Structures are given as structure tokens and as C-alpha cells.
């Protein structure tokens, strides 16, 4: 740990910001691994479109993890990018859908994005009074995460605006319902 932080930011605020950003770093590391898992395990009609749609998002999220880790270091703290850090910071269950259809994976992935975006927005609110530069970083990330969720949802939405997995609160439940609706 260093004995400095950013000029104009107290050590206490820097520590609070770094703690928030550490959780975000773990979220991004978990998300890019989950996206690769989906990329490798999606099957069925529309496979190639979804398979190829996911890789750019993986790279984007990996980039977000790097930006957040570098911001933590800039604050004079040590970013933790280990599997143990992901598990320690995790407030969600491990992604549970294995080899499955496009619809099943996308429905489960939509719920993953719900959690990531909700947590990111909470961090954005908390950063309002702590560090506007870090807040700005997460605001930019949130916009892109929301756009990608829209890409996912476009595959799941009916002409009437209903999602195939509406009402489901678990990835498995969402995947099961989407699979049944697409059969």
C-alpha cells in the first residue's frame, strides 16, 4: 500500500472509493468469465450470431476491469484481480447454465446483466459524494452495459414487448422458461 492518494482526495475517501471499485473489479472479472462460458456453451439456431455477438462484449468488459484496476492503483491502493477476490466480493450465485440453447443462455444472461447494472448504478450513486472521476468512469461503463443488455433482450422480446423469461428470478428458471417458449 502506498502512502499517497490523488491530490484533493482524503485518505478516507480514497479508501472508500477503492473499496467500491474493488467490488466493481470483481464484478467485471466475473462477468467476462461468464460471457466466455456462454460463448463456449451456446448451441442451436442463431448460434453463430450470438457466439460472435458475445466476444466484443467480453473484450469491452475486460477493458473495464483494467480501467477500474488502474483507477484503484491511482488512488494509491492495490487492486485484487484473483479468483479469491471474485469469490470474496461476490453477492451473487455462480452462473449455472451449462451447454444450452441460445434462448436459454440469453435469458439467464439477461438476469446477470440486471444484477451487474443494478450494482453499478448503486456504486454510481455512492460515488456522487466521494469521487466524481470514478463516478464518471462507471457512468460510461453503465451505458455500454445497458446497451449490450438491450442486444440480449432483443433476442428474447416478443412483438408485444414481453420477455420470454418474464417473472423468473433465477438464471436456471429464466433459462428453463425461455427454452420452453422457444420449443
Curated annotation (Swiss-Prot):
Which residues of the sequence carry a binding annotation for Fe cation 1?
39, 66, 70
Please list the reactions this protein catalyses.
Answer: 2 Fe(2+) + H2O2 + 2 H(+) = 2 Fe(3+) + 2 H2O
Record PROSITE patterns: DPS_1 (PS00818)
- Fill in the subunit field for this protein: The 12 identical subunits form a hollow sphere into which the mineral iron core of up to 500 Fe(3+) can be deposited. Homododecamer.
Q: Can you tell which superkingdom this protein's organism belongs to?
A: Bacteria
Provide the GO MF annotations for this entry.
DNA binding; ferric iron binding; oxidoreductase activity, acting on metal ions
Domain text:
12 di-nuclear ferroxidase centers are located at the interfaces between subunits related by 2-fold symmetry axes.
Q: What is this protein called?
A: DNA protection during starvation protein
Gene Ontology cellular component annotations, sorted alphabetically: cytoplasm; nucleoid
Q: What is its EC number?
A: 1.16.-.-
Record's keyword annotation contains Oxidoreductase: yes
Q: Which UniProt keywords apply?
A: Cytoplasm, DNA-binding, Iron, Iron storage, Metal-binding, Oxidoreductase
Where does this protein chiefly localize? cytoplasm
Looking up SUPFAM superfamilies in the UniProt record yields:
Ferritin-like
Fetch the InterPro entries from UniProt: DPS_DNA-bd (IPR002177), DPS_DNA-bd_CS (IPR023188), Ferritin-like (IPR012347), Ferritin-like_SF (IPR009078), Ferritin_DPS_dom (IPR008331)
What sections of the sequence does the record tag as coiled-coil?
A: none
Query: Which parts of the sequence bind Fe cation 2?
Result: 70
Compartments it resides in: Cytoplasm, Nucleoid
One example of a Gene Ontology biological process annotation = intracellular iron ion homeostasis
One Pfam family per UniProt: Ferritin
Region entry Disordered, spans: 162-183
| UniProt function note | Protects DNA from oxidative damage by sequestering intracellular Fe(2+) ion and storing it in the form of Fe(3+) oxyhydroxide mineral. One hydrogen peroxide oxidizes two Fe(2+) ions, which prevents hydroxyl radical production by the Fenton reaction. It protects DNA from hydroxyl radical-mediated cleavage. Binds DNA with no apparent sequence specificity without self-aggregation nor promotion of DNA condensation. Is unable to protect DNA from DNase-mediated cleavage.
Describe the family membership recorded for this protein in Swiss-Prot or TrEMBL: Belongs to the Dps family.
